[in-house]
């Protein structure tokens, strides 16, 4: 998937998310092997030729796709309801970047007010470390709002309320369905 920024708003998010889901549906993946070790090797090393991330392994594509879904569904949630805890955000569109290695996953501007954000999809066992790393990445940046969007099931075995949000650091847990049908029903 190209790393160029996408501008998402209420007028285009459904269409763009539907196209992204179609890319996921087009993904060809290795079938189960009789040898479990061979299957795991293919999962981690065999390059895909389709989907949003061709030329990476299914394992890597899965990591990227689920992080992308956190961004898509988080921005959709923000566009439909601008409240994050007790903070109302003034933004009507968000600039997002998928599979970002440098910079931020999302940004928004509304006149003189600026937001930067990061998003991730992580297992519950890695949640605290990933959250701490993300807070550290954002804390010294210059923005009116800093936002962290993450998969809500990462909170399993942790406090259901990760941190208390305030404008200097907002936390948005997002439910990410496990099937394409469930996601399609959300949009």
Language model features: what each stretch is:
Residues 1-47:
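Nuclease-adjacent, charged terminal/linker segments that flank catalytic cores
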Residues 28, 62-63, 77, 147-171, ...:
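Metal-dependent nuclease catalytic core centered on acidic motifs
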Residues 96-100:
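A short beta-turn/loop motif at secondary-structure boundaries
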């Amino acid at each position: 998937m190209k790393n160029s920024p996408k501008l998402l708003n209420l007028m285009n998010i459904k269409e763009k998310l539907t196209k992204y889901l179609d890319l996921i549906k087009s993904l060809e993946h290795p079938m189960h092997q009789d040898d479990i070790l061979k299957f795991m090797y293919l999962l981690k090393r065999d390059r895909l030729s389709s989907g949003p991330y061709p030329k990476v392994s299914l394992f890597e594509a899965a990591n990227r796709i689920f992080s992308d879904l956190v961004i898509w569904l988080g921005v959709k949630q923000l566009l439909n309801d601008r409240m994050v805890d007790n903070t109302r955000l003034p933004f009507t569109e968000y600039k997002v970047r998928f599979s970002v290695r440098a910079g931020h996953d999302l940004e928004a501007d509304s006149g003189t007010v600026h937001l930067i954000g990061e998003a991730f999809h992580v297992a519950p066992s890695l949640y605290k470390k990933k959250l701490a790393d993300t807070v550290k990445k954002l804390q010294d940046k210059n923005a009116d709002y800093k936002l962290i969007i993450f998969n809500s099931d990462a909170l399993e075995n942790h406090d259901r309320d990760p941190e208390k949000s305030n404008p200097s650091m907002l936390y948005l847990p997002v439910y990410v369905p496990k099937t394409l049908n469930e996601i399609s029903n959300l949009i």
